[in-house]
Amino acid sequence: MTATGTEVAARRLPFYAALSYDGRITFEPSDPLDAAIIGADSDHQRRDKGFGPALGPDAAKRTIAMFEAVGYFVVNAAADWVLRPHDRDMLVALVDGWASAAREVGQQSLPEIATWLTHRRDALSHEKSSIRVGHIDVFAAPIARR
């Protein structure tokens, strides 16, 4: 992000990033392993994707700080996903993906992850689950020179 931000600022261009995941996830109903699984997913998102370590859930706050440091006017706002039982396909894809990331990171045992995933899928199949996934939109623009 630093190289992109430096180039944008050097050209005095505006910058907009939509739906930057910020690490906030809440489940209804909750499960004792939610925080551990989501923590593992956040660690997974920070892994090197071929360009060095990724920012993962820190991307929005780092982007805000970077543009403020170069004198840009920055506006940001929550743009959370709120997924309800009728969003079942998306909910299933999310919990499956989070479980997969947790398995790759290896901070929890495979039986713990399987138990968490079974609990989440069961709640989804009975339409008793909703999830809020925190995102932030960021707009940055150079302050006009006089």
Predicted stretch roles:
Residues 1-2, 27:
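Short glycine-/acidic-enriched loop or helix-start segments at secondary-structure transitions
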Residues 2-16:
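A short glycine-rich, Lys/Arg-flanked "PGG" loop and its adjoining helix->strand segment in the class I
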Residues 3, 58-62, 135:
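Short, well-structured alpha-helical interface segments that form or flank functional binding sites
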Residues 6-9, 29-37, 87-95:
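Short, surface-exposed, charged loop/turn segments at secondary-structure junctions
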Residues 7-8, 65, 129-130:
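A general structural signal for short secondary-structure junctions and capping/turn motifs
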Residues 13-78:
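Conserved catalytic/acceptor-binding region of the Class I
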Residues 70-146:
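Conserved Class I S-adenosyl-L-methionine
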